[in-house]
């Protein structure tokens, strides 16, 4: 008797990806975030779909429609806050997933890594456009400030910004197109995730030691399915605690004020997960320079495979690189804090130093330390 699981054209793809997939026997909980990101994406698409059923993308009614969802729709408040805080959980998992990749040298899977960086950009774009939709003060001014950055592009900048706006300011046309893009992009993300997995399954997973694990593989199911379920439980628990006890903890109070083009909020700042990049943007006095630094702060991830000079793949047995890695983490936390502070002394200089350190660690310090460790192996 043939096993349908292994012969059916469609089911066998699922089988090779989630059931009979050979996985290293020693991957730790840091490898759980891939499945958690998949779950986050599903939660976001489902809650987003139900929100879109009641939301109107018109400047006159957008804010009221969100209020209507929270007050009048059955469990609308739950759906709305699951969607808003689900985005935060998504980014927490993303940052940990990327951090894991950096620590254990997963970036040597070149295609998988680069698709991952493109995914990061796409998710950031989606989150930015989603933040504009409730049409509160921070939505409007955030959209104005961030889209305005494109005007720094020489020659075509101003035309480009007005083309994106669909007018001479952020208005009805902007909101409508942002809603359209915010709706379609998660499906683009889902397609990219498939490609990400396709490339990953060409090589198999990395593991904490960074060594080849072909000699010791175990089936994904039941070992890692049960392990993933634990991660899922913890993620859902954290999300629901956030949603049910302090849904506005990570939001901005200014977004409960309807958008008003005539009154600028005292401190315009994005959601917490963009603050590190926002701090880098603000730390450069020149507009174009700031925009380039902002883009390069994420794009620099693509350089990691080229900057890897160590003879070992993982940082597991490289204490010096470990120290530098954790300094980088501390630096990113510092940048996140600075991004939420007003532009005044001493925050300006702290932000500038943290920005310089960020690029210095990645481009200079980590490769140098890797070479020192290579030398130490010979002695």
Swiss-Prot record:
Family annotation (InterPro entries): Cyt_b/b6_C, Cyt_b/b6_C_sf, Cyt_b/b6_N, Cytb/b6-like_sf, Cytochrome_b, Cytochrome_b_C_euk/bac, Cytochrome_b_N_euk/bac, Di-haem_cyt_TM
Organism of origin: Spermophilus pygmaeus
Keywords, comma-separated and alphabetical: Electron transport, Heme, Iron, Membrane, Metal-binding, Mitochondrion, Mitochondrion inner membrane, Respiratory chain, Transmembrane, Transmembrane helix, Transport, Ubiquinone
Cofactor detail note: Binds 2 heme b groups non-covalently.
Cofactor list: heme b
Full protein name: Cytochrome b
UniProt-listed GO biological process terms: mitochondrial electron transport, ubiquinol to cytochrome c
Membrane topology: Multi-pass membrane protein
Any one Pfam family match given in the protein's UniProt record, by short name: Cytochrom_B_C
């Amino acid at each position: 008797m043939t096993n349908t699981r292994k012969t059916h054209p469609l089911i066998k793809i699922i089988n090779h990806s989630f059931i009979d997939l050979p996985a290293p026997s020693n991957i730790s909980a840091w490898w759980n975030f891939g499945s958690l990101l998949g779950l986050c994406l599903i939660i976001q698409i489902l809650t987003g779909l139900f929100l879109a059923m009641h939301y109107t993308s018109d400047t006159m009614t957008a804010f009221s429609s969100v209020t209507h969802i929270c007050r009048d729709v059955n469990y609308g408040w739950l759906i709305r806050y699951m969607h808003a805080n689900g985005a935060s959980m998504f980014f927490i998992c993303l940052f940990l997933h990327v951090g894991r990749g950096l620590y254990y040298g997963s970036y040597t899977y070149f295609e998988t890594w680069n698709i991952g960086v493109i995914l990061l950009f796409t998710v950031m774009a989606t989150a930015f456009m989603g933040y504009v939709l409730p049409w509160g003060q921070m939505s409007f001014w955030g959209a104005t400030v961030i889209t305005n950055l494109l005007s720094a592009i020489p020659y075509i900048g101003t035309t480009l910004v007005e083309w994106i706006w669909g007018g001479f300011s952020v208005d009805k046309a902007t909101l409508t197109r942002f809603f359209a893009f915010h709706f379609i992009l998660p499906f683009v993300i889902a397609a990219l995730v498939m490609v990400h997995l396709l490339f990953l399954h060409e090589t198999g997973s990395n593991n904490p030691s960074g060594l080849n694990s072909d000699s010791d593989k175990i089936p994904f199911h039941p070992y890692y399915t049960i392990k993933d379920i634990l991660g899922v439980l913890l993620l859902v628990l954290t999300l629901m605690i956030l949603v049910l006890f302090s849904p506005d903890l990570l939001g901005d109070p200014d977004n409960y004020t309807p958008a008003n083009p005539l009154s600028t909020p005292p401190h315009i700042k994005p959601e917490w997960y963009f603050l590190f990049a926002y701090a880098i943007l603000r730390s450069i006095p020149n507009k174009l320079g700031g925009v380039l630094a902002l883009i390069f702060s994420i794009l620099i991830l693509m350089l990691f495979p080229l900057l890897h000079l160590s003879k070992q793949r993982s940082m597991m047995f490289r204490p010096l690189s470990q120290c530098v890695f954790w300094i980088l983490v501390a630096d990113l936390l510092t940048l996140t804090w600075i991004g939420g502070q007003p532009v005044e002394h001493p925050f300006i200089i702290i932000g500038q130093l943290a920005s310089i350190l960020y690029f210095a660690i990645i481009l200079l310090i980590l490769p140098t330390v890797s070479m020192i460790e290579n030398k130490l192996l010979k002695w």
